[in-house]
Curated annotation (Swiss-Prot):
Possesses an unusual extended V-shaped dimeric structure with each monomer consisting of three distinct domains arranged along a curved 'spinal' alpha-helix. The N-terminal catalytic domain specifically recognizes the glutamate moiety of the substrate. The second domain is the NADPH-binding domain, and the third C-terminal domain is responsible for dimerization. GO terms for molecular function: glutamyl-tRNA reductase activity; NADP binding. This is Glutamyl-tRNA reductase. Pathway: Porphyrin-containing compound metabolism; protoporphyrin-IX biosynthesis; 5-aminolevulinate from L-glutamyl-tRNA(Glu): step 1/2; Porphyrin-containing compound metabolism; chlorophyll biosynthesis. The gene is hemA.
Length: 431
């Protein structure tokens, strides 16, 4: 397990300004891996997302491997290694395994449980395969990471429930309208929170976005950034009937949308529902709008209450997911240890079989003699080795106890070896 090494930066350790200098696109990731391979690194994988830039490696001297990975990471900036002092992730061995498991399970993301990271990891894995830097150790790590990610998603609620105000708004819009591809969103005002919510709804699949504000130049600037059209604020009552979602954020506590305007709007819409987000602080929508049957009004406090429920659910799911990851790390360690023991077990089996055949050849017609020969030969080497081990140790008692523990485990001996031997001697003297 000591062969795994990882160096990198992420949102938990490194400021965004520094992370941004190290971001790699797919061709740059591939080129980095090719350079590492040319420098003798047999296994490597590089992951670059908005949250992290991390390079994983395996094989050879861990210190030398770490130095190579760090050199390539710093060359991206380029930045001096000293600039990363105290601001980077630097892991070895089983800690690397646990880290990768947490990444694929979305436990290391800025938004706990976000679903996109697994696809990003798989893309990085494909790039590493194409670059020729995925060996058996890396492949084993990645397959185990995908398996635990699947378990976490299926056995916990880590990805359920929105946790930000904008995500809550998007979820409510989907619940109300279903597929958002045919919906129209009207952004009334250009206050920052309103823009953020409108942008999230746009990312959720809203078909059309119209920006309308008292100051048209500001509306045009926001519309250009969001790829939206601009509506005439003077014709607001004509814009509203086409809007399935209205996000209001003009600031200053001004009343931008009243009950009477919405009553007329709903009548023209034949009471088709409208989702309204009041993003103003203080509010910009007349509270009585919520009395209208087809108007679904949420202010920021309403959205925050739903988001808090989502965060609480994810916190509980996070604890469950971390427990699953810990179990998976332990299982991975056991599996790797068992695989490492396979050659020795095969050699032991071959040795025993050779001794069995020799004993049979020397006493082909005498089972008693053959079995005595076999037992004697099988025990001779280990017995001599144990005597030499105890005699050559400065702490003979300690080595004897360790040897007894090993023998009990190897041969499932039921009691203390010393006591068993003493009992056998006593029984023999009585005979």
């Amino acid at each position: 397990m000591d062969g795994y090494v990882m160096v990198g930066v992420n949102h938990q350790t490194t400021p965004m300004a520094l992370r941004d200098r190290l971001v790699l696109d797919d061709p740059a990731l591939a080129a980095l891996l090719v350079r590492l391979r040319a420098r003798g690194v047999t296994e490597a994988l590089a992951l670059s997302t908005c949250d992290r830039v991390e390079i994983f490696g395996h094989g050879g001297d861990p210190r030398a491997l770490r130095a190579l990975l760090l050199a390539e990471l710093c060359a991206v900036g380029p930045i001096e290694p000293a600039a990363l002092a105290g601001q980077m992730v630097d892991l070895r061995g089983l800690a690397v395994v646990a880290h990768m498991f947490r990444i694929t399970s979305a436990l290391e993301s800025q938004v706990l449980g976000e679903p996109h990271i697994l696809g990003q990891v798989k893309a990085a894995h494909r790039i590493a395969r194409d670059a020729g830097t995925v060996g058996s150790a890396t492949e084993a790590l990645m397959q185990a990471a995908y398996a635990i990610a699947k378990r976490v998603r299926s056995e916990t609620r880590i990805s359920e429930g929105p946790v930000s105000l904008a995500a809550v708004a998007a979820q409510i819009a989907r619940d109300l309208h279903g597929d958002l591809g045919e919906t129209c969103l009207l952004l009334l005002g250009t206050q920052e929170m309103g823009e953020l919510i409108a942008e999230q709804l746009q990312m959720a699949g809203v078909g059309r976005l119209v920006v309308c504000a008292p100051r048209r130049p500001r509306a045009e600037a926001v519309a250009a950034r969001l790829g939206a059209s601009v509506g005439d604020h003077g014709a607001l009552l004509d814009l509203l009937p086409n809007a399935d979602i209205v996000v209001v954020g003009v600031g200053g506590g001004l009343l931008a949308l009243g009950e009477e305007a919405m009553r007329r709007t709903l009548k023209r819409r034949r009471n088709r529902p409208v989702f309204i987000v009041d993003a103003g602080v203080p509010g910009n929508v007349e509270p009585s709008v919520q009395r209208l049957e087809a108007a679904f009004l949420y202010d920021l406090a309403d959205l925050e209450a739903v988001a808090e429920e989502g965060r609480a659910a994810r916190d509980q799911a996070s604890r469950e997911a971390h427990a699953l990851v810990a179990d998976a790390v332990a299982a991975f360690e056991r599996h790797r240890a068992e695989r490492a023991a396979v050659p020795a077990i095969a050699a032991l089996r071959a040795h025993f079989e050779g001794e069995r055949l020799r004993a049979l050849a020397e006493a082909p017609d005498d089972a008693e003699k053959a079995t005595r020969l076999l037992v004697g030969r099988l025990l001779h080497g280990p017995s001599e080795a144990l005597r030499d081990l105890a005699a050559g140790s400065a702490d003979k008692e300690f080595m004897t106890v360790r040897a007894e523990m090993l023998l009990r485990r190897l041969f499932d001996l039921p009691t203390s070896i010393a006591e068993t031997g003493a009992t056998d001697r006593e029984d023999g003297s009585k005979g």
